[in-house]
Amino acid sequence: PGATLQXAXXLLVAVXAXPPPPLGVXPKPXPG
């Protein structure tokens, strides 16, 4: 359990700090 929490945390920290995902992944804003 401890290892899973650590990995998740780490993963959350990496996502957060990391750069934003490509526009293709995220939802595209509408043209309006």
From Swiss-Prot:
PTM comment: The soluble form derives from the membrane form by proteolytic processing.
GO molecular function terms noted in the UniProt entry: beta-N-acetylglucosaminylglycopeptide beta-1,4-galactosyltransferase activity; galactosyltransferase activity; lactose synthase activity; manganese ion binding; N-acetyllactosamine synthase activity; UDP-galactosyltransferase activity
Cofactor dependency: Mn(2+)
Chief location category: Golgi
A single BP term in Gene Ontology: positive regulation of apoptotic process
Reactions that this protein is recorded to catalyse: D-glucose + UDP-alpha-D-galactose = lactose + UDP + H(+); an N-acetyl-beta-D-glucosaminyl derivative + UDP-alpha-D-galactose = a beta-D-galactosyl-(1->4)-N-acetyl-beta-D-glucosaminyl derivative + UDP + H(+); N-acetyl-D-glucosamine + UDP-alpha-D-galactose = beta-D-galactosyl-(1->4)-N-acetyl-D-glucosamine + UDP + H(+); a beta-D-GlcNAc-(1->3)-beta-D-Gal-(1->4)-beta-D-Glc-(1<->1)-Cer(d18:1(4E)) + UDP-alpha-D-galactose = a neolactoside nLc4Cer(d18:1(4E)) + UDP + H(+)
Catalytic EC class: transferase
EC nos: 2.4.1.-, 2.4.1.38, 2.4.1.22, 2.4.1.90
Function per UniProt: This protein is responsible for the synthesis of complex-type N-linked oligosaccharides in many glycoproteins as well as the carbohydrate moieties of glycolipids.
Family to which this protein belongs: Belongs to the glycosyltransferase 7 family.
Protein name, as recorded: Beta-1,4-galactosyltransferase 1
Organism annotation: Rattus norvegicus
